Amino acid sequence: MNIRVEKDCSNVDWNRLRAVLKEAGMGYHDADIHKKAFENSYSKVFIYDDNELIGLGRAISDGVYQAAIYDIAVLPSYQGYGIGKIIINNILESIPQCNAILYASPGKEDFYNKFNFRKMKTGMAYFQNAEKMYERGFIEKFIVLNNENR
């Protein structure tokens, strides 16, 4: 492997990024949506083997005391080689004074525990499609409320 880390969006093939997310079993959108999300993020990390994108991640942050980490993905054929560790460490180094909330895929908790991430007792999320997130294991339960309950 010839691993290279990039921290800007200038060389990203957004269709390839979409494919990496899909192959890693993550949520994915049109390439233009990912481009906008990464370009507007505080921190981003892209991992290449030679010129092939194999892993990625990003954080949104105020850069002072709060951050949220999203889209940590490594191609399955590269998992277990420390690529995810490189991504997480680079992101955490970019937000050294910040508390960070992580949006992780179900079943990946043990990996993130190695970096001192812990489950929150008070964390909550609003999803555009709560039923889908329930089916994918992201939330424990959901109750459909109409707009009058807000």
Task: Mark where each language-model region is.
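A conserved beta-strand-loop-helix scaffold within acyl/acetyltransferase catalytic domains
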Residues: 29, 33-73
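Conserved catalytic-core motifs of GNAT/GCN5-like acyltransferases
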Residues: 101-103, 113, 118-138
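Conserved GNAT acetyl-CoA-binding A-motif
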Residues: 93-106
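A generic "binding-loop/recognition-motif" signal
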Residues: 65, 107-108
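Conserved acetyl-CoA pyrophosphate-binding loop and the N-cap/start of the following alpha-helix
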Residues: 78-87
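Short amphipathic alpha-helix that is part of the acyltransferase structural core
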Residues: 1-32, 123, 135-150
